[in-house]
Amino acid sequence: MKLLISNDDGISALGIRTLANALAEVGHDVTVVCPDRERSATGHGLTLHQPIRAEIVESIFHPAIKAWACDGTPSDCVKLALWALLDSPPDLVLSGINQGANLGTEILYSGTVSAAMEGMIEGIPSIAFSLTSHISRNFQPAAKFATILVEQLAAKPIPDLMLLNVNIPPVEWEEIAGVKLTRQGVRRYVDVFDKRTDPRGKTYYWLTGEVLEEVEPPEGLNLPQNVPIDVHAVKDNYISITPLQYNLTYATALDKLSNWNFPMS
C-alpha cells in the first residue's frame, strides 16, 4: 500500500521512525512528511500568514522511505504532502506513533489526531496511533500492531470514510490483553499556569497540570452504552480503536431545540 505518515512530535521522534521503518520493511511504499520540531497539542491549526518550507531529510529512516521535514503544523504537513509533494494520493494517511495518549477529550487538542483528520477531510481513510505513556520508549509493540492493522485494511478496507484513533498500552506485546472497539470518553485536567518573571521583569506563564478524573461522557449523545470507553480499555491493557468523524453535529440536540423560536421583528 502507498502510505503517508506524519506526526506532531517532530521528524526526530522515535515513534514515527519506528512506525515508518516497520511498514517499509514489510514492503509498503512509505512517505513521511512531518514537522521539523515538536508540535504537540497544536490541534488542527494551519499556517496562513507566512510561507511553509519543507526540506528532504536523509539518513533518519529506512532507505526506501522518502521523507520531508516541514516547518508547519501537523495538518500543514498532511495538506502539503497531498497537494504539493506526492505524485498521487496515498491509500492511507497514518499519524504517530505519538509519545503519550490521545484519549477522550484530549483528541480535540491533539496534533496527532488532527494530522490524521486532515487525511480524512481530503477523502483518505486515516489512522492515528498513540503509545499511552510519556516515559516508555518501547514503540515496537505499537508498530507491530500498526503493521497488522494496515495489512488487514489492505485485504479488507475500512467500510466508510473514517478515522481510526488507536491507543496502545505501554506494555510488552505478550502483556497486551487484546483489542477493543471503543467510544470516546472524557479526560479532565487540573490546569495550572506557573507564573514566572523573565530577566526584563515581564511576566510569562507555563501551562502544566495532570489528569483529574476520567468520567463517562455526558448523557444524550446517543452512543452505544454496551461499547467500552477508550480510557477504560487502555487501563486494562487493551488496544483501543475508536472510529471518529469530523462532523461534530450534536444530532440529538436538533430535536431538543426544534421548538425554539427566533423572532426577527
From Swiss-Prot:
One of its GO terms (molecular function) is 5'-nucleotidase activity. It is found in: Cytoplasm. GO terms for cellular component: cytoplasm. Its EC number is 3.1.3.5. It catalyses: a ribonucleoside 5'-phosphate + H2O = a ribonucleoside + phosphate. InterPro entries: SurE, SurE-like_Pase/nucleotidase, SurE-like_sf. A divalent metal cation binds at D8, D9, S40, N98. SUPFAM superfamilies: SurE-like. Binds 1 divalent metal cation per subunit. Its cofactor is a divalent metal cation. It is an enzyme of class 3 (hydrolase). Keywords: Cytoplasm, Hydrolase, Metal-binding, Nucleotide-binding. Belongs to the SurE nucleotidase family. Nucleotidase that shows phosphatase activity on nucleoside 5'-monophosphates. This is 5'-nucleotidase SurE. It comes from Trichormus variabilis (strain ATCC 29413 / PCC 7937).
